[in-house]
Amino acid sequence: MKLNILRADPAGNITVFVLDPVERAQRAAIAARIMAIPSLKAEQVGYACPPEDDVDGHMEMMGGEFCGNATRAYGMYIASQRGGLSEVRLRVSGCDHVVTARVDLRAGTARAEMPCPRSVQRATAGGREGTLVDLGGIAHFVVENVEPSEEFFRAAEGVFSGLPNLDACGVIFLDAQERRMTPLVKVIETGSLVWEGSCGSGTVACAVAQSGHMTN
C-alpha cells in the first residue's frame, strides 16, 4: 500500500498526517508501521478525512484521541490548501465540537482552541502525589520532581482507570523550578507509549495543576 503523507513539526511534537482515505480498522496498524520508520521520527499519526459541509477540514488521530499540536498543524495545512485562510474550522477526534484554528501563514504560526478540564483531582501513584486532569478523551497525571521513567508511568497507569471514555493518557513529569515538562503519552488503541517533544494538552494540564484551582 502506498500512501501520501505529510510530516509536520508543531513545537517538536512530530506528527505524520496520512492524506489518503484509510479505514478506521486499519489505522492503528498503519500508524505503527509509520512510527517504525526511523527517518520520520514520528511521535504520532493523524488521518485526513472528508470534511462535512460545516467545516474546512476533518482530521482524526490514530487512536481517536485529541491532540492540540496536531490540530494546529492540520489547521495550517488546510489554510495553505484553501488560499491562505486565517481561521480554519476543524472537526477533530476526541472533541465533541468544531474547533477553530487561527493561522498566520506568513509568520508560520497557528493557534487552536483547547478543551477545558472535565475533572481535576488529587491522586497518588508510586508513592507520589500529583494532579489528575481529565480533558475528555485524554487525561494527564501531573507530578513534580519525579525522575521521568517508563517505570513510573506503569506505576501511575492505574490512576486513569476510573475515568470514562479515554483514548489516550499521559504522565507529565514537571520540573517547576526549571519550567520544564517531560510528557510520556500512551495511545490506548495502538498501545504506543511515546516520549513527546511537546504536548498541548499536557501543557494545559500543567497550567491547571500549577494554578491550584480544583473543580472537584
Give the predicted meaning of each segment.
Residues 1-108, 119, 131-134, 140-216:
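A glycine-rich beta-to-alpha transition motif near the start of alpha/beta enzyme domains, typified by
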Residues 108-114:
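Short, solvent-exposed secondary-structure boundary/capping segments
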